[in-house]
Amino acid sequence: DPIPLDYRLFEPYPNPFNAQTTIEFSLPLKDVMTIKVHDISGKEVRSLVHGIFDSGEHKVHWNASNLSSGIYFIRMESRHFVDTKKISLIK
């Protein structure tokens, strides 16, 4: 597979979701990444990823069955990149 040209956080799918969703991201180079979930008030409710990832495309599965229905924000951050995607949990 070709190496991505830039950092990217894709739209989570499915969205809206019930209990489980998939978060995909790509990196053009090896980097330390964090992906965290925040509620509508900005409070961190889950840390999904914290580690070193090689360049390429990656997937993270999130099971939110213990959280309430509502709007959440997926935030991906590295030394070179920050992006946030909105997601709706519907039970």
What are these regions (language model features)?
Residues 2-13, 17-91:
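C-terminal outer-membrane/trafficking sorting elements
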